[in-house]
């Protein structure tokens, strides 16, 4: 019995793994940017930091996955956007620290290599990288029979960015009187899906719920996470923002206080939050308390900016999109976030 046959009998298809690598090369090529060194398939991805032109570079890194949103991608057999979610979750955290994302690596684990499906996943990763301006410089695809079912897979990513030391955003610049500006989310993004799946467990995904304005439920649930790099980076370069919050798991209540020091409070005007239809549907069909929605979901705001009043107009000028003035920073109240 040859070694190849022995491995195949264990459930690992080496040839399928080679096919995956060949299929994804064209997608990886789309993401190339200045600073990339080496070629796909080496033992390590390489990047020349001197190409960024940053004088006092500070590296900022982030890693994340997409949680149980993957289970809906598998359920609905749609795999070409979930990779964008993975990239977004990493690079949005990096931009919140005032850094420009540079490169990304992905990790896919599956019970059985399906080259067509995995190419779809990586195509979404590449699309996310293009939107974020980062290079996909490496990754790993692990076939793990016995660990995962044949149709199952998990996806995680890792990103690295660079910031000028003087432009780092760590919450220390946010002050009383700052205006809170919200940038719209594209949907649920990639958090809260254990609850989402419970609420819609008995739905096929093809439903046209009245709250969803003519869209099929599955399309709304799998809407990819918005990537905010292109919107936020010019603001960082001009030093127009004092704080940035990526509104992910834990919603407003957990993420907004991460923007500023403990002696401040964010006062949010709920009427100015652009709540998306899917959140109204979740609250209704899931019988979720209204205040709890803000503890779980982004509610329509995926990125929040703390901006000095004198810079608000310039920020709006640079952002070619609706910008929502949803609150302000005040002296410390009983809670770190007050929604009124």
Swiss-Prot record:
Q: What class of enzyme is it?
A: ligase
Q: State its location(s).
A: Cytoplasm
Query: What GO biological process terms are annotated to this protein in UniProt?
Result: 'de novo' IMP biosynthetic process; adenine biosynthetic process
**Matching HAMAP family:** AIRS
Q: Which family does it belong to?
A: Belongs to the AIR synthase family.
Looking up InterPro entries in the UniProt record yields:
PurM-like_C_dom, PurM-like_C_sf, PurM-like_N, PurM-like_N_sf, PurM_cligase
Q: Which transformation does this protein catalyse, written as a reaction?
A: 2-formamido-N(1)-(5-O-phospho-beta-D-ribosyl)acetamidine + ATP = 5-amino-1-(5-phospho-beta-D-ribosyl)imidazole + ADP + phosphate + H(+)
Q: Which GO terms describe its molecular function?
A: ATP binding; phosphoribosylamine-glycine ligase activity; phosphoribosylformylglycinamidine cyclo-ligase activity
Pfam families attached to this UniProt entry:
AIRS, AIRS_C
GO cellular component terms, semicolon-separated: cytosol
Q: Where are the transmembrane segments?
A: none
Which keywords describe this protein according to UniProt?
A: ATP-binding, Cytoplasm, Ligase, Nucleotide-binding, Purine biosynthesis
What's the protein name? Phosphoribosylformylglycinamidine cyclo-ligase
Identify the EC number(s): 6.3.3.1
Organism classification: Bacteria, Bacillati, Bacillota, Bacilli, Lactobacillales
Under SUPFAM superfamilies, the record lists:
PurM C-terminal domain-like, PurM N-terminal domain-like
Which pathway does it operate in?
A: Purine metabolism; IMP biosynthesis via de novo pathway; 5-amino-1-(5-phospho-D-ribosyl)imidazole from N(2)-formyl-N(1)-(5-phospho-D-ribosyl)glycinamide: step 2/2
Q: Which gene encodes it?
A: purM
Q: Which residues form a coiled coil?
A: none
